[in-house]
Amino acid sequence: MTNTERNIIKIIKELSLEEGFAIQTFSFDWIIKVNDKYIVGYNFDINSSAASAICNDKAATYEILNANDICAVEHNFFMSPKNAKYLGEEQDYTEILNKLKKYKYLVLKPNNGTSGEDIFLVNNEDELKERLELLFTHYQSIAISPFINIDKEYRIIVLDNEVKLIFSKNLPNTTRCCNELVKFNLCHGAIPEIVEDEELISKLSNIALKAVKIIGINFASVDIVDTEGQLKVLEVNSGVMMEHFSRKNNEYYEIAKGIYRDAIKFMLK
């Protein structure tokens, strides 16, 4: 999918006609100017740079949420060896190896990665060394998590401390094995479905609203996982992408359009 083919481009062009704001596009439609504000990718000129930076750092997000008693999936920060000098304290391979011995299975991923790319499950030292070398070749830092079995994943979109949408990311009907790394990303084939259970909506909303308040972000999508009956924040995204959601059917397209309409109005006020 090229930048021009993104639904957000189509939606914003429609909204410009309906709402009467001017738009310009730059960088092959990756940047959209709306009146005197900018949308870069899926990041609206609504959030502070600090809040956005926290969201783009998986380990920092975990630390902040955990420090404020918000249940989140553990992410531990490790800098690549060539950049470790900037930490002011030593990090070494032994620390990572000890985590593998403790938890048996570890998940390794880029600390600022997106779209479920370059995520690896390891359960022995040879795999660990191989994956660490690969990741540190391409990324300055990684996040390491104890493996957890995820039963379900939800996305909650929040604007100005109000929940706008909650949907689950349902996996296609495939056989799953215990201790298997499963990606619930929509771009990897998961199917969005709006959550209608009122009790679940209340629980997810409560967690998401606490998370965005602590981070201080105005427009975000919060991913929450159900692991053995416990709800945990997986990550908070400062870029609100609804491409795959909006492509499911016309109803979902109009919902996404309504959220982007509200976000632009909030941005321009």
What label would you give each PLM region?
Residues 117-206:
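Phosphate-binding site of ATP-dependent enzymes
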Residues 106, 164-165, 232-235:
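Protein kinase-like catalytic core scaffold
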Residues 1-36:
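Non-cleavable N-terminal signal-anchor transmembrane helices
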Residues 31-41, 155-159, 230-244:
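A short beta-strand motif that forms the metal-chelation/ATP-contact edge
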Residues 142-146, 155, 217-228:
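A short glycine-rich, hydrophobically flanked beta-strand micro-motif that places a catalytic Asp/Glu
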Residues 111, 147-148, 157, 223-225, ...:
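Anionic group-transfer/hydrolysis microenvironments
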